[in-house]
Structure formats: structure tokens, C-alpha cells
Amino acid sequence: MNPLLSVHNLKKIYGEGCDDCMGPSPRPGPDNLCPICGSIIACTDVTFDVYPGEVLGIVGESGSGKSTVLGCINLTTPVNGGEILYSRLQSGIRNILEVDAQTRRTLQNIHFGIVYQNPHLGLNFSISGEGNVAERMLVADSRNFAAIQEKVHNLFERVELSSARFKDYPINYSGGMQQRVQIAKALINAPSLILLDEPTGGLDVSVQAKILDLIRSISRELNVAMIMVSHDIQVIRLLCKRIIVMKHGRIIESGLTDRVIDDPQQAYTQTLVHSTIQ
């Protein structure tokens, strides 16, 4: 099976950069800072594949670079090096970092969906939940309003939102309901890839479990590829067949999730595993 998405040698630097941190083998010091110029090395030399229908997990502590990688894939974070190859454009396999503005919008609005930990990043709080999801179809040039409304309502039912709450504004939803609306918005245009950036962070444990169950059932039902970012390695274990462990902007370990968690080779991975068990 050919990859849906291939990330090669991805690099993101915050700051002016220098020959050292912009080179092929930067040496970040404490807090991911370049010891020469002080720029932040958010991620460097990040390489991995995502296959159709799989759920890939990226785990690491705050500042490890995992959310930066998602932003680069979603084309909302400019990169300093590398390539991201995507196979589902009509023109064939393309490096999406080099596409024009129109193709970029097509990727963001149709091919990819994203769910943020902070719902304010994913939802417009000045329009209804129904409007948030319908708006994404309008951006994708859907103009049959009756069909849009029917599809939105069907999807809301799929993510277990009561029809009585369709027209409520996001501010009036609970945290779990806000995440359900984000999930509906991410799915509405039948994307090939869903990006999940700590989607259960900050939620009560019982609500977290329900959202994770929803994500797992959607993955199985729709066979859509997902990249799940989390600091909680047990959340990754629940959803993901393969895992990437990041530290200081680099991938330090990867493989089948059960293998990595049951027999971690790196001390940092061992710490992540033990911290969630305790």
C-alpha cells in the first residue's frame, strides 16, 4: 500500500536562524534553543508516512514539536525545510508545501480536517454550531442549501448532538459538545486525513472517554486516516496502531504502538510510559 502522506526532513525554526540551526544537523540546547543564535528549533529532521485508513499517534511533552508538525501539514505553519508529499490531488503526488494558494485552500477545506484542543481555534463563536459546519461546505463551493442542511443534521446525529441544540452558539455548549461540533466540521467534506491536536485535553475524564470512543468509531466506520497528537501515551495506545515519540523537535522512537509502549528503547519513552501508569 502506498502512503497517503509522506513527510520528509521537515524543519521549522522560529527566529532568524543561522548556519548552524538551518543546516542539516542542528544541535538544539535547553528549551529547543539554538546555542548560536537563540532561535527556537520547533522541529527538525521529522520523517514519517501515513497510510490510508490508519490512525498514527504522535506523543511527547509540551514543546516536543508535535503540534508544530500538525500545523505544517495543515499548511497553517510555514516551514523552513523538507517536503510533504500528498497522493490524493487530481494532479497526482504533490509536495503540498509548493502548491498555489487555490490548491492550498482546497487541501485545507476538503482534503484535510482538523480538531483542536482549544475550540476557539476551530469554531466561530459568533455563529451557531449548525452554521459552523455548514460554512465549511460553503467554502468548498456547495450551494444546494437544502442538501447542506440535511448533511449537517445527519452528521450532527452521527456525533451524537441533540437536534434541539443545532442552532445554539458554541459558547452555550459544554466542552465535550464543542469538540463534537469540531469533529463534525472536520468530517463534513469527507476528507482523506483528519488531524487531531489534543482533542480531549482539558475535558473531564468521563467526557474524554466518550470523545475517544467517538473518534475510534468514526475511524473504523469511515476508514479515514488520522494523525493524533497527545501528551498522554495511553490515549495514543487506545486509538493508534503506530506511534511516533518526539522530544526537542526530533523523532526519537517509532514503531507499532504496543511494541513501543511495552518495550520502550529510549529513556524518554520509558519516562512517558511510567508517568501515565503511576
Which ranges hold each PLM region?
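A short, surface-exposed alpha-helical micro-motif characterized by mixed small hydrophobic
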Residues: 236-238
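Helix-to-loop junction immediately C-terminal to a conserved catalytic motif
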Residues: 74
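Conserved ABC ATPase signature
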Residues: 169-173, 177
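Conserved ABC ATPase "signature" region
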Residues: 26-28, 146-164
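ABC ATPase NBD Q-loop/coupling interface
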Residues: 83-106
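ABC ATPase "signature
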Residues: 254-255
